[in-house]
UniProtKB/Swiss-Prot annotation:
Its main location: cytoplasm. Keywords: Aminoacyl-tRNA synthetase, ATP-binding, Cytoplasm, Ligase, Nucleotide-binding, Protein biosynthesis. One of its GO terms (biological process) is aspartyl-tRNA aminoacylation. CDD domains: AspRS_core, EcAspRS_like_N. This is Aspartate--tRNA ligase. The gene is aspS. NCBIfam families: aspS_bact (TIGR00459), PRK00476.1 (NF001750). One of its GO terms (cellular component) is cytoplasm.
Amino acid sequence: MKRSMYAGRVREEHIGQEITLKGWVGRRRDLGGLIFIDLRDREGIMQLVINPEKVSAEVMATAESLRSEFVIEVTGQVAAREQANDKLPTGAVELNVTALIVLNTAKTTPFEIKDGIEANDDTRLRYRYLDLRRPEMLENLKLRAKVTHSIRNYLDELEFIDVETPFLSKSTPEGARDYLVPSRVNKGHFYALPQSPQITKQLLMNAGFDRYYQIVKCFRDEDLRGDRQPEFTQVDLETSFLTEQEIQDITEGLIARVMKETKDIEVTLPFPRMKYDDAMALYGSDKPDTRFDMLLQDLTEVVKGVDFKVFSEALAVKAIVVKGAADNYSRKDIDKMTEVAKQYGAKGLAWVKVVDGELNGPVAKFLTGIQEELTTALALEDKDLVLFVADTLEVANATLGALRGRIAKELGLIDNDKFNFLWVVDWPMFEWSEEEGRYMSAHHPFTLPQEETAHELEGDLAKVRAIAYDIVLNGYELGGGSLRINQKDLQERMFKALGFSAEEANDQFGFLLEAMDYGFPPHGGLAIGLDRFVMLLAGEENIREVIAFPKNNKATDPMTQAPSTVALKQLEELSLQVEEDETSKTN
C-alpha cells in the first residue's frame, strides 16, 4: 500500500480521511482492551488505536505481538482524540487502525530511542543508526541540510561557481599532519587527503573562474576535542579582484541569510571588528566570547613597586575581576583553578577577595600600599574576587582567557540565546613554535602580508602582519580567510622566511610558483567550518552531534571498527610492510 503521508504530519484537517502510514513502533500500551501504539517516523509521532471490536482477530493478534522498533504499515481513519496531547504536533488526532502489517521485527535495542538517554558515546556510535532515530539527532541533521541549502542558494545568487577539487593531492609540510594514501601504481609514492582545497582554489582563480565555492570534506590527522574531527566539512570560498572588506561583506550576507532562514534571527550588519592584539589583551583569546564582560586588566605598572617579587619582577601582571563572586569560590575551588592555570604555562594563580572594603587573601598583605590605586584601576566593589597571573604576557593572557571562559560557565554568566559574531583582523603573519623551534605560518604560507610590514620578511618576522581575518561566534573560530599572494617573488620570499630552500620550495610548490608566471590575478577567500557552525546553531557542545557518522576521540569508528588492519596481499600490492611495536611483540 502506498504511504499517504508522514506520520508526524497528520493534523485535524485530515479527520475523517482514510490514510496509510509507515514507520517504527515507539511505544505500545494496552489499556481497557484497546492497544495504543506510538508510530514514529522522521517527521514525528502519531498515536494509533487498535480496537478489538473494529478489527479482525488476525489484526489484533499482530498488534499484540508488536515490540519497540518493529517496522509496521497501518491503514485506518483519522479521528479526533478525546483528550488532546498539547506536547505533540499530532496531539489532536489519532488513527483508528483497520489494517496492520509487520514489515520487519527488531531485537531489543541497547538504549531507548528517545531524547535524553544516558548511553555512553561509544555505545551511541557503535549503534549510530539507532542513535540517529532519536528526534534530537534527526532534527540536528535536518538543520544541517537547511544550512547547506541556504548557503548554496545564496552563493548561486551571487554567481559563485561550485567546483569540485581533488581528494587525492600532494602532501605539503605546513599545517597539521596529513592523512597519506599509498599509490599502487607509483610504488613508494603517496597522495595526501587535503587539509583544505587551498592551492587548488587559488589555481581556479588563475584559471579565471572569478568566484568559486564548494562545500567540501577536509582531513587533518590531529589530536581530537569536542569541536574537531579527523574529517570535517567546510564552506570554501575564493574570489578574484575583491578587497578584504568585499569578501567580509559577502560572508556576512551569507551568515545573515542562514540565521534568518534556519533560526528566524535577524543579525545586525556589519559585524564588529577587533584587532588581534586587542582580542588577546582584553579577552586572552584570538576567538573572544563577547557575550559577557570580565575583561583582562593589565596591572604591570600598578604593581611595579610592591614588595612581592612575583609581581614586581614579572614581565607582565594581569588580572580578571569576578564581580560579586567572593563567596562562590572557596580556597579549594581556587586551588582547582590554579591547576588549570598551570596547564596554560602559568607558575601559579594569585588572588584576593574584597571583604567589607578590605583586600583578603594570600597576597593581600603585599597590596595594602596600592589598595586605593588597585581599587580604582579594577573598579573593585565588595564581594569581588580578583585573580592575578604574573608571567610572560603570552602566558598571562592565555591563562586568564581560559579561566574567564570557565568561570563564566560555572556562574551562568553566558546568555546562550545570543549569537555574537565578530571579525578578528590585523593578524601576525607568523607564530613561534616551541616544538619546531622556528616561526610558522599563523594561517598558511600563501597569505598576503600587509605592504607596510612585508620588508620584515628578511628581518623581524614577529613584526610582519597579514591581511587575514577570522570570523568568530560565541568564543569559537567559525572560519578564517585572507587575501593571497599572487606575485612569484613575494611567494618565494615567504617560503624563504619559513625556512624553505629554493629547492625545497620548488619541490613542494613548484606548480604554484610556475602558475604565477602566467598572469595570476589578485585574489582572496575564506572557509567556514560547517560542522562547528551547525553545532552552535543547534545548541550542542560537540560536533559529533551534528555529523551523521563521526569518529570518537580516538579517531576510530566503533560501528565499522575503522581504521582496521588489511590483508597482507593488499599491503604487498602497495609495497608496504607494517612494523610491530614492542607492545605487540610481547603479547
